[in-house]
UniProtKB/Swiss-Prot annotation:
Catalyzes the phosphorylation of the 3'-hydroxyl group of dephosphocoenzyme A to form coenzyme A. InterPro entries: Depp_CoAkinase (IPR001977), P-loop_NTPase (IPR027417). Residues 6-206 form the DPCK domain. Gene3D superfamilies: P-loop containing nucleotide triphosphate hydrolases. This is Dephospho-CoA kinase. ATP binds at residues 14-19.
Length: 206
C-alpha cells in the first residue's frame, strides 16, 4: 500500500498556518495540532502542569487553578532564559504526545497526516515528518495580524515574533513554501497544486 509522507506544517505566529491546516483537513488529512497538545499538558493532572507552577510560581494560576497563559506569556516572552526553561519542561511532553498520536493514526490505517506545529524547527522535531511546509507572510503582515487578533501592542507582538526562529530562515529549510499573504482562495489553489504534483487525486480514490 502506498503511504503518504507526513507533512510538518509550520510557520511564524499569525502567518495563517491554521488556515492552511483547515484546508488540508477539509481535503481529508488528519491533523495533529501541537498547540492544542501544548495547552492540554498544562492542565491539572499532567506532569508538566506542576513543574511549570513549581518553576514560575502560583501567581500564574487563575482562581480555579488553571495556568493563565497570558500571565505565563508575560514572564517568558522577552526573556530568552525563562522561555528556554519553559520549553525544556513542555517540549518533551509535547513530543511524547505527538509520537503517541502518530502511532495511533498509522496503526488505524490513516496515512494522510499533517503535524501542525509552530515550533517544528525550534523544538528540533523535524525528524517526525517527511516533508516540511512553511506558511509565509511578510513580517509587517504578521505584526498587523497579531496585533489585531490578540490586542497586542506593537512591542508585545514583536516580542512574540522574535521568540521564534525568523520566518525567512524557516523558508530556507522548507520543502514547500505557501504564500498566505493573499486570499484564502489563492492559498487553497497553492495547496491543490502541490498535492496534484503528489498525484493526490489518484490517492484520493483509494
Amino acid at each position: 500500500m502506498l503511504v503518504l509522507p507526513i507533512i510538518g506544517l509550520t510557520g511564524g505566529i499569525a502567518s495563517g498556518k491554521s488556515t492552511v491546516s483547515r484546508i488540508l483537513q477539509e481535503l481529508g488529512f488528519a491533523i495533529i495540532d501541537a498547540d492544542r497538545i501544548a495547552r492540554d499538558i498544562l492542565t491539572p493532572g499532567h506532569p508538566a502542569y506542576q513543574k511549570v507552577i513549581d518553576t514560575f510560581g502560583k501567581n500564574i494560576l487563575t482562581e480555579d487553578g488553571q495556568i493563565d497563559r497570558a500571565k505565563l506569556g508575560k514572564i517568558v516572552f522577552g526573556n530568552r532564559e525563562k522561555l528556554l526553561v519553559l520549553n525544556s519542561i513542555t517540549h518533551p511532553e509535547v513530543l511524547k504526545e505527538i509520537r503517541k498520536k502518530i502511532k495511533e493514526l498509522t496503526s488505524s490505517g490513516i496515512d494522510w497526516i499533517v503535524l501542525d506545529i509552530p515550533l517544528l524547527f525550534e523544538a528540533k522535531m523535524t525528524s517526525l515528518v517527511d516533508e516540511i511546509w512553511v506558511v509565509y507572510v511578510p513580517e509587517e503582515e504578521q505584526l498587523k495580524r497579531l496585533m489585531a487578533r490578540n490586542g497586542f501592542s506593537r512591542d508585545e507582538a514583536l516580542a512574540r515574533i522574535r521568540a521564534q526562529m525568523p520566518l525567512e530562515e524557516k523558508v530556507k529549510l522548507a520543502d514547500v513554501v505557501i504564500d498566505n499573504s493573499g486570499s484564502i482562495e489563492s492559498t487553497r489553489e497553492q495547496i491543490l497544486t502541490i498535492l496534484q504534483k503528489w498525484k493526490w487525486k489518484d490517492w484520493s480514490k483509494k
